[in-house]
Structure formats: C-alpha cells, structure tokens
C-alpha cells in the first residue's frame, strides 16, 4: 500500500475525552472514529488490525475442529422468552420492534439462536459432538460506554457453541477450546493468563477467563508465584488461616466513638491496628426467611467478595445491600455502628474473622463500639464461610506459594453451560438407548475488537503503538527520503516495495511529499514494527537504515541484503 492511495488519518493531539491509552492511540493513529456513545467507525488502519486478529482466531478455531456459521444480529424475542433471559438480562438487552410491532432484540449473545438452530437440525447422538462458531457483531446497551472499543456498545465477537450427549464429551471440547485460545493469544504476541472464573449471567458450571495483563485493566488477576494456579478476584479462594485463634487478653468494653463511622476513622482516632477491627455489612435475605436481612462480617482491611456472598444459600440474588432505613428499622443503629454483639439477625463471618480475638466492632448503638470482643465468650461463633477478596501475599489455594495480583483485561471466556439453554428450549436428540436426550452445551467467546485495544494497552510507548508482527496493520514501512527529487531513491523504493510484497509481507510505502519528521512520527504512531529509510547519503555506501520499532535500535544493512533480513525477521 502507498500512502498516496491510503487514508492515513493521524492526529497530533490527544482527544480530550479519551481516558485510556488504547482509546487515545486508536484515535490518534487513525484506527477509529466515534459516531455516537459507544459506537465507532473503523478506518482502514484499524480494519487491517481487526482482520489479522480475525484470521488468527479463524485459523485456530478451524484447526480445533469448529465449524463456521453466521447468525443474524436481530433475534426474535420469542427465543429469549423461551430461555427465560427476556426478563433476566436487564437493560443491556436492546429491545426493538419491527413495522408489525413484533418484538425483537439486538443480540448481545447467540445462545438462543444456535440452540434453536440445533434443535431443528440434529436428531441423533451419531451427529455429535459438534462445535459451531461465528465472528459477528454484538450489541449491549452499556449504561456508561467508556474506554473506546474496550467497553463499547457495538463490538465484534467470536462466539462458539458446542453440543454433546455427555459431560465427558463436553470436557474434551472444553479442553480443546482452552488449548486453541492459548494458541490464539500466543500467536498474537500477548502476555496473558487463563484464570478460573465465575460463570456469571451466562450460567453453567466450569469457566475460564483469558486475561491480557495490563495496568489499565479493569479486572484483578490472581496467580501463584510458585505454580500455575490462576483465578479472577471473584473466584479465587481465600484460604482459612492455619494459625488457631489466639486466647483472649482483653475484657470487652463499650467505648464512645461519636466521630468514627468508618473503619478508617476508628483506626485513626483510637490508634487501633486495622487487622483488629471488623466491619459488618447487611444484605437482603432470601424471600421467606425469618429475618429480612443477613449480616456479613469481614476483617477491617479486607473487602467483601460480592460473588461469593451472593452464593450463600440464605442471601438473596442479586446481592442487595440494605438501606440505612432498613438497617435502623431492624437494628436501631446506623451502618457505621454495626457489629456482632447483640445483633438480632443471622450472621455469617469470613474465615479470617473466625480466628480473630480482642477485636473491635460496632455495638449496634449509634456512636459506640465494643473493643476487646472475643468469640464464644462475648458472642457465639456464627456460621463461617469464605466471603472476602483475596489479597496479595495470601497463600495459594493449591498449597504452592503465595498469591500475586495484577490488573487484566478480559479478552476471552469459555464456559461449560451444561443443560441451561437446551433444557429450557427442549434441544434434544435420540440417544444411544433410543430415548430423547437433552443436549449438554459449552460456549466460548473472544472479544475481537477488545483484543485490539488490549494489545495496545500492552504494547506502546510515548511515540505510539508497538504492534506485535502478527497483528500489525503493516509489517514494514518504507520511507524514501526526497524520492520525488532522487530517481535513485525512487527506483530502489519501488523495487523493494515489489519484492517485499512478493514475499507476502504487508508494506506501507510513504510516497507523500512530506518532511522526514512527519513521516517518522506517523509510522511510529501507527506502530509499524519494521522501518527502512532510503536516503542518498547512505545509498552512496550501498546502505539502508533499518529501525526496529520495539526497541528503537537502528542499523545499516546493505541494499542487497535488506529483503532477506526482513523476511527472516518477520517470518523466521
């Protein structure tokens, strides 16, 4: 490609509304332009990256035995009502009507559509297992789209769905998808972790997320420093302390704390170690419980894990925190004065809280706390459960090493769905015994547009993007200095351009009448990995300047060797 025949829409200034580096650089590099909130037009440079990501995904899915299909973005509401998600999905599901006032949705996922297809196409266990995938536009009406294509409303996704007659068969395909995803992200040159995850709104049993490690990531990625254990923050188990509870050394005393309504204020005003404090959070109980609220206790320096808490059988789903009015009606004290002593509702405490002694907590009286509380002496030990987020330094749940925490961007997710959708939609085949058998399903997603942004978050410097070779919009930039005045430079540029393209290398030749500084800045901004500079001075010595974008190193290479050098650098 020649810049004279290309739309190179680079920007010098960073747009004010771009918060994260990928959004800033995608705008500045001329990859995307905003159309409306959460909606983006992809420009030629962006599309080239997108297609390379798609191609890698498609190749590895095909290699893993998946079959490509293409399903409609617009889906009839009847399918969503049949699966039960019409009511469950919430406002992210964009509901529309056609001219006949028939309700439809813009698909955020395609479980219903593929299940409907399969129940009408398959009739025997002999046709299974099968794994279908598509690369298709999705739409989720995010309440606050942000971070460019990282959290947009419309996005491109690879979603796959597998169908089985046994859990063993599902596990085989699940493992194959795990391997395929690992190959996909490795080929793209990304630093990623596959982590155990909660199944969330999709449902099902086993689940893994594929997280690209990046400082700007929205997720906490947990992994051991001594093993391959990895999980997301919602799933990671906080192991119970091995040390037994220490003996009581203090009497419980009631202390006036009128200005301490938070743990931080209590610690500061009374010089308490935060590890000796407990915070009490009240949430709604399941309908029909003797008490409308449940108390959840975690150590003062720990955070409640809402996913774990919601899974407690006595806690209502979705997890809902009690309002101050509801708390006062039941406990007669405000949220900043709650604690386990004389609390008239059921209590669940975290494993760490269970081994605490001589601790401080609210007295369930406004402006007062109890200091020196001890379990079984001052209050009976309640139910104990893992309800907190892990922290760095916690022991790894597999018993090997301690936990580290890094930020991550979720780019892929695989689920063992089981029979959630097939049961609801009666997707069955004739089994080996001649009876109807409900199908077991898996689903496997990759956010194609999100991968592009995540790759940038991991590969940039102060001059722009640093693409890995496999997904760069162009692999080589040819910068001919003063080519419009130097026939020698022009002739060599054209020769190298043709030779590199003949080797299947994506080349961008900058044939604009621009200053060298502008040409260099643009090529670095859009992140082309390999740049060759042709100038009369170096050509006098039969040399070409080569620059590698990732480390900025320059070297002179003989004109007769440059093509071979680049082919080897790119293709190995």
UniProtKB/Swiss-Prot annotation:
One of its GO terms (biological process) is prolyl-tRNA aminoacylation. It is found in: Cytoplasm. It comes from the Bacteria. Transmembrane segments: none annotated. This is Proline--tRNA ligase. GO terms for cellular component: cytosol. One of its GO terms (molecular function) is proline-tRNA ligase activity. It is an enzyme of class 6 (ligase). The lineage of its organism: Bacteria, Pseudomonadati, Pseudomonadota, Gammaproteobacteria, Enterobacterales. The gene is proS. Homodimer. Catalyzes the attachment of proline to tRNA(Pro) in a two-step reaction: proline is first activated by ATP to form Pro-AMP and then transferred to the acceptor end of tRNA(Pro). As ProRS can inadvertently accommodate and process non-cognate amino acids such as alanine and cysteine, to avoid such errors it has two additional distinct editing activities against alanine. One activity is designated as 'pretransfer' editing and involves the tRNA(Pro)-independent hydrolysis of activated Ala-AMP. Consists of three domains: the N-terminal catalytic domain, the editing domain and the C-terminal anticodon-binding domain. It catalyses: tRNA(Pro) + L-proline + ATP = L-prolyl-tRNA(Pro) + AMP + diphosphate. Belongs to the class-II aminoacyl-tRNA synthetase family. ProS type 1 subfamily. Keywords: Aminoacyl-tRNA synthetase, ATP-binding, Cytoplasm, Ligase, Nucleotide-binding, Protein biosynthesis. Its EC number is 6.1.1.15. InterPro entries: aa-tRNA-synt_IIb, aa-tRNA-synth_II, aa-tRNA-synth_II/BPL/LPL, Anticodon-bd, Anticodon-bd_dom_sf, Pro-tRNA-ligase_IIa, Pro-tRNA-synth_IIa_bac-type, Pro-tRNA-Synthase_IIa_type1.
């Amino acid at each position: 490609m020649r810049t004279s025949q290309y739309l190179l829409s680079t920007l010098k200034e960073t747009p004010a509304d771009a918060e994260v580096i990928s959004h800033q650089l995608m705008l500045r590099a001329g990859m995307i332009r905003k159309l409306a909130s959460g909606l983006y037009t992809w420009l030629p440079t962006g599309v080239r990256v997108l297609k390379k990501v798609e191609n890698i995904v498609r190749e590895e899915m095909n290699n893993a035995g998946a079959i490509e299909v293409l399903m409609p973005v617009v889906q009839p509401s009847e399918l969503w009502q049949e699966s039960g998600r019409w009511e469950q999905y919430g406002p992210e599901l964009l509901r529309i009507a056609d001219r006949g006032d028939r309700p439809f949705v813009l698909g955020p996922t395609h479980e219903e559509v593929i299940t409907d297809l399969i129940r009408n196409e398959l009739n025997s266990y002999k046709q299974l297992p099968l794994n279908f995938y598509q690369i298709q536009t999705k739409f989720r009406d995010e309440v606050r789209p942000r971070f460019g294509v990282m959290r947009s409303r419309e996005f491109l996704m690879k979603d796959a769905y597998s169908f089985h007659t046994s859990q063993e068969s599902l596990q085989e395909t699940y493992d194959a998808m795990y391997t395929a995803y690992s190959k996909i992200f490795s080929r793209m040159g990304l630093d990623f972790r596959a982590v155990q995850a909660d199944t969330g709104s999709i449902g099902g049993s086993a689940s893994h997320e594929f997280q690209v490690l990046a400082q700007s990531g929205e997720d906490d990625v947990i992994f051991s420093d001594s093993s391959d254990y990895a999980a997301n923050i919602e799933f990671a188990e906080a192991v119970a302390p091995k040390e037994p509870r220490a003996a009581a050394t203090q009497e419980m005393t009631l202390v006036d704390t009128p200005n301490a309504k938070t743990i931080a204020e209590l610690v500061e005003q009374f010089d308490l170690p935060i590890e000796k404090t407990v915070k009490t959070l009240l949430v709604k109980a399941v309908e029909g419980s003797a008490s409308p609220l449940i108390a959840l206790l975690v150590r003062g320096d720990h955070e409640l894990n809402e996913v774990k808490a919601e899974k407690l059988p006595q806690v209502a789903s979705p997890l809902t925190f009690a309002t101050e009015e509801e708390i006062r009606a039941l406990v007669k004290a405000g949220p900043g004065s709650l604690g386990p002593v004389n609390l008239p509702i059921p209590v669940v405490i975290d494993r760490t809280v269970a081994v605490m002694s001589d601790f401080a907590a609210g007295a369930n009286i406004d402006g007062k706390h109890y200091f020196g509380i001890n379990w079984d002496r001052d209050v009976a030990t309640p139910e104990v459960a893992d309800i907190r987020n892990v922290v760095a330094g916690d022991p790894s749940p597999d018993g090997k090493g301690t936990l580290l925490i890094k930020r991550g961007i979720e780019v892929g997710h695989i689920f063992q769905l089981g029979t959630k959708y097939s049961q609801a939609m009666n997707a069955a085949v004739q089994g080996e015994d001649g009876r109807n058998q409900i199908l077991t399903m898996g689903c496997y997603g990759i956010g194609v547009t999100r991968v592009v942004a995540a790759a940038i978050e991991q590969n940039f410097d102060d001059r722009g993007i640093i693409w890995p070779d496999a997904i760069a919009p162009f692999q080589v930039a040819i910068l001919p200095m003063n080519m419009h005045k130097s026939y020698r430079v022009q002739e060599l540029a054209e020769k190298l351009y043709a030779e590199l393209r003949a080797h299947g290398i994506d080349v961008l030749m900058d044939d604009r009448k621009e200053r060298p500084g502008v040409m260099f800045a643009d090529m670095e901004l859009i992140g082309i990995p390999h740049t060759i500079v042709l100038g009369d001075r170096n050509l006098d010595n039969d040399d070409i300047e080569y620059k590698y974008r990732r480390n900025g190193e320059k070297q002179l290479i003989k004109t007769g060797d440059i093509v071979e050098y680049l082919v080897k650098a790119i293709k190995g």
